[in-house]
């Protein structure tokens, strides 16, 4: 509990003890009134003050006004204990609500704890000066000690360490980083001293963008929240006028038309009971709190949601479209097979790696990585790169060619046809065919499991879009269990394909696009819900996406959908429960069957139950 909550708790205890003690005292008349006013003012002075300020500001019809009128009316009718009890239990409900919001905020603030307090700038004499991260310019060298947060995005110039990214990704496994590696702000340096050259200003760094996104999430309200806001705007004045009519019309009818005693006191008490029952706190508080808790729970799982409207849309997702490279595959080319004739595997890889040693092409890098030994460029001469075909060179005086079938055709070398899916590098040594090396993009470890999990979530169709060859795309789709694949697409074709799918789906069905944030901004924006995966350090993805998954695990997609559906389920549970109980109690109150104690349950009891139910949205670990 914070200080404010502790003060309210003490007031509740004091007022409750005084109310019980006074109920046992044999006092009556003015003395009883004066004595009961003590616990009433102890517990309710702030509500009365808020109600008075609301009247002065012409914002009359709110829960404070309802509570003030109902309790003052009960006291004026001589029901002192009921008047104090209504205010007492209302404050208990408010305390529960405050605690629930605080718990949700703590989840968000744990994420907010990634905000760095300072940056260490190294002076010319070698000493360190602590400055505000906003003051650090691009290209500055900052020093990050063990245990400190990385304040600004940059590249490591000196040092090696393990980085704790759990606050950003929800994953506890540390990430190794050394010289030349990019580091993002918000990570915690676990071991060595790092010197980092900044590549961004603090305002443009990853941590700043994430914090800005989370802080603004509450401004984007869902359809349910907007409905409740409009509902409360008209509902509260309506029940106030209804209570007034209940207090005046039945007694007048009894007096003027039926010739009976009006029984003003009984009907006024019914009207006050009606007011207490009608207080919309359970709805007005629990619905936004459910979404707030859902966003907080999601952030702890490494899923950042930009607003409750996106959480609501995600829960209705029936079509999921994936970009292939970097989303379902790792986007890293690796040698997946070596098929040789007379030459052994290691010698073939050595020739290929040396022939490609001067190239920075991803395929060249994968060949050098597969060979795995130091390369001596001095062994290589007469290097000639043939654009779109491959490379020829002399390795230790031996003519080596590495490339596609077109290169082999140019050289007059008959090559073996390869039916495996991937990029084929044919090898010719000394004018003779020596074999081929197969290079492919590796599928992510949990990709197949992720597709199965989506189908289990009720997703009707999964679609993959890629610029790869038809055969390669088809094999990946079949291996993963993806329903539909569109290949050989240019970036603009992906937008057109998503628009076509949007036209085909049902009106209430939503389409989500999942990309890695690289060149995906137009498609992320066009889909009903844009999900950027592994978006750490990708400004475009954080900007364009509605939901950001902070690591590369495709299983997080189905988890995000389950979180959204749990949150929406809780929202509807609270709506049906609160409205159902209130309608029943309002009817019973108007008929004089439900007394003030029943009204207390219909207001405070329902609010406490709804708030406790809303807190469940925080618990996402088992989803």
Residue map of PLM features:
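P-type ATPase nucleotide-binding
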Residues: 335-461, 470, 482-498
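N-terminal membrane topogenic signal
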Residues: 1-14, 235
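Bilayer-spanning, highly hydrophobic alpha-helical transmembrane segments
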Residues: 14-16, 227-258, 270-291, 572-601
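Conserved ATP-binding TGD loop and adjacent catalytic N/P-domain core of P-type ATPases
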Residues: 397, 423, 429-573, 581
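Conserved catalytic phosphorylation-site environment of P-type ATPases
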Residues: 66-68, 168, 269, 279-355, ...
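Juxtamembrane helix-loop transition segments at the membrane interface in multi-pass membrane proteins
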Residues: 52-60, 99-109, 289-308, 617-623
């Amino acid at each position: 509990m914070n200080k404010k909550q502790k003060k309210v708790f003490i007031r509740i205890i004091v007022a409750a003890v005084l109310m019980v003690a006074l109920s046992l005292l044999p006092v009556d008349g003015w003395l009883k009134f004066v004595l009961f006013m003590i616990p009433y003012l102890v517990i309710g002075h702030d509500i009365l003050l808020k109600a008075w300020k609301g009247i002065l500001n012409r914002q009359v019809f709110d829960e404070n006004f309802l509570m003030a009128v109902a309790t003052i009316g009960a006291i004026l009718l001589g029901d002192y204990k009921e008047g104090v009890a209504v205010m007492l239990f209302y404050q208990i409900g408010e305390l529960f609500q405050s605690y629930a919001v605080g718990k949700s905020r703590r989840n968000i603030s744990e994420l907010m704890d990634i905000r760095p307090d300072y940056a260490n700038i190294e002076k010319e004499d070698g000493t360190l000066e602590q400055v505000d991260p906003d003051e650090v310019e691009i290209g500055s060298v900052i020093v990050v000690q063990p245990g400190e947060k990385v304040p600004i995005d940059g590249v490591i110039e000196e040092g090696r360490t393990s980085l704790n990214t759990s606050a950003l990704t929800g994953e506890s496994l540390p990430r190794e980083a050394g010289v030349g590696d990019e580091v993002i702000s918000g990570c915690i340096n676990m071991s060595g001293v790092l010197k980092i050259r900044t590549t961004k200003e603090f305002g443009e760094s990853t941590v700043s963008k994430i914090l800005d996104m989370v802080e603004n999430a509450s401004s984007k309200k869902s359809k349910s929240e907007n409905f409740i806001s409009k509902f409360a705007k008209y509902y509260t004045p309506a029940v106030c006028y209804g209570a007034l009519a209940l207090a005046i019309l039945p007694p007048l009818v009894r007096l003027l038309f039926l010739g009976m005693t009006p029984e003003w006191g009984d009907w006024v008490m019914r009207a006050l009971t009606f007011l207490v029952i009608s207080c919309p706190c359970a709805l007005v508080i629990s619905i936004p709190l459910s979404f707030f808790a859902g966003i907080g729970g999601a952030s702890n799982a490494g899923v950042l949601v930009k607003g409750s409207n996106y959480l609501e849309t995600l829960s209705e997702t029936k079509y999921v479209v994936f970009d292939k490279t970097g989303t379902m595959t790792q986007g890293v080319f690796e040698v997946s097979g070596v098929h040789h004739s007379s030459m052994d595997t290691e010698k073939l890889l050595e020739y290929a790696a040396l022939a490609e040693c001067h190239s920075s092409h991803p395929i060249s890098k994968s060949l050098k990585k597969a060979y795995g030994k130091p390369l001596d460029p001095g062994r290589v001469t007469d290097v000639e790169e043939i654009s779109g075909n491959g490379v020829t060179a002399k390795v230790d005086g031996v003519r080596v060619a590495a490339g596609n079938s077109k290169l082999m055709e140019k050289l007059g070398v008959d090559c073996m046809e390869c039916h495996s899916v991937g990029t084929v590098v044919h090898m010719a040594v000394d004018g003779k065919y020596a074999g081929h090396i197969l290079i492919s993009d590796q599928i992510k470890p949990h990709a197949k499991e992720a597709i199965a999990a989506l189908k289990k979530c009720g997703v009707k169709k999964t679609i993959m879009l890629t610029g790869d060859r038809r055969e390669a795309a088809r094999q990946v789709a079949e291996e993963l269990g993806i329903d539909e694949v569109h290949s050989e697409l240019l970036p603009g074709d992906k937008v057109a394909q998503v628009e076509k799918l949007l036209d085909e789906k049902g009106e209430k069905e939503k389409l989500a696009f999942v990309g890695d944030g690289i060149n995906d901004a137009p498609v992320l924006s066009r889909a009903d819900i844009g999900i950027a995966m592994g978006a750490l350090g990708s400004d475009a993805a954080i900007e364009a996406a509605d939901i950001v998954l902070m690591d590369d695990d495709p299983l997080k997609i189905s988890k995000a959908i389950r979180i959204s559906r749990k949150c929406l389920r809780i929202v509807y549970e609270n709506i049906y429960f609160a409205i159902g109980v209130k309608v029943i109690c309002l009817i019973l109150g108007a008929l004089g069957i439900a007394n003030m104690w029943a009204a207390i349950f219909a207001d405070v009891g329902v609010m406490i139950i709804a708030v406790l139910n809303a807190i469940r949205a925080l618990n996402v670990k088992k989803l």
